[in-house]
Amino acid sequence: MILNSLSLCYHNKLILAPMVRVGTLPMRLLALDYGADIVYCEELIDLKMIQCKRVVNEVLSTVDFVAPDDRVVFRTCEREQNRVVFQMGTSDAERALAVARLVENDVAGIDVNMGCPKQYSTKGGMGAALLSDPDKIEKILSTLVKGTRRPVTCKIRILPSLEDTLSLVKRIERTGIAAIAVHGRKREERPQHPVSCEVIKAIADTLSIPVIANGGSHDHIQQYSDIEDFRQATAASSVMVARAAMWNPSIFLKEGLRPLEEVMQKYIRYAVQYDNHYTNTKYCLCQMLREQLESPQGRLLHAAQSSREICEAFGLGAFYEETTQELDAQQARLSAKTSEQTGEPAEDTSGVIKMAVKFDRRAYPAQITPKMCLLEWCRREKLAQPVYETVQRPLDRLFSSIVTVAEQKYQSTLWDKSKKLAEQAAAIVCLRSQGLPEGRLGEESPSLHKRKREAPDQDPGGPRAQELAQPGDLCKKPFVALGSGEESPLEGW
């Protein structure tokens, strides 16, 4: 058995709840700024996490857990290391332990989601589906408690009867977990249903471990003082806040809520500093604006198709330029240092225009790439076709490409995992140095529209179409009025 070290205290704490799409690094840091004691990341599925590699990101000063497709699944930093709890979705004890061991050196605690009622969680036997399988719950939690260095917790919903609920939580307590978070609603209930404070209180009276009360955002928590009132009503050790914190993270501030625009600007700064993908940034800002989405500010946010445009919508254009330039410069310095350490032969690159850029497929429409934009521009200007020269570095098998256009060479200082990606990066350098659009979402060249229309038809409901539609859809319907009978993306959190 591995003894848990650096135990996180769950007594008398204000906690940011795990929330899908919301609990990424910028929101967690913002909640800490405003007074949260502990912050949970969004639920991350074990099957996805066990494919990830741990990468130290020296540019951002973060630790990233990166999927095989190079997407960052989980990002954390030193500032939250002793206060962030990693929540996983799992239905298998061994997978859960593998994930816990992967992240345990970078987080303060490990939590298992046993309360999410959404189909994407329950269909895999995760989330609230676990509530009907106490044996599996016991195996998962016992395995984690014995096998990881961090305190283990779980988050549940209440069962149809108080007797069954108390029986379950007593069995959970015997696994040796450090605390239990209780969402005071049944699996089938939604935010418009009242939270059962009396059931949480009965659980708190029954257990000796800390009980964390959750589910009071709509009925109970409108301001800071309400958090303590909710804690007393449930007799809980601590309170976990979800929606109220999503709407305005300064709910944790003892001095009272800060103006929303101030909060949003602070959130955006973190999002830029930590390279948060703009679709996630946009989603979180939409949750904060809520009824104000039809305001001038809301319309600007709705139209934004990049982090730069989001910053400009909130008067942070200069901050974006300054920050991204600093990050690019840091990346260039690190790349140069890496080249020296790998012992690459020095080559004459005088006259080569260089930038630290990478090609991110998610930032471009399905039928448009920087290489296509560059080729189209060369044809329009009656220039020879771009010529790409690509080399592979033997040590790590990464690629770098130089593109020649009108006798001028362009190159990204960042090495890529494939020849195609390296060529796209070189094309971006050329386009940016010429002040030309590179085809990103929201800045497509009109001359390419015909080519897009002539491309083979794609399934309008396919995964890529849904991905591209997502940001706008999220802003059009960022939340559901409680009592409407409809479900919000955040149900169960």
Swiss-Prot record:
It catalyses: 5,6-dihydrouridine(20) in tRNA + NADP(+) = uridine(20) in tRNA + NADPH + H(+). The keyword Ribonucleoprotein does not apply. Its EC number is 1.3.1.91. Residues 330-342 have a biased composition (Polar residues). It is an enzyme of class 1 (oxidoreductase). Residues 330-349, 438-493 are annotated as: Disordered. Residues 369-436 form the DRBM domain. Changing K420A: Decreased affinity for tRNA. Strongly decreased affinity for tRNA. FMN binds at P18, M19, V20, E43, Q87, K155, H183, N214, G215, G216, A242, R243. This is tRNA-dihydrouridine(20) synthase [NAD(P)+]-like.
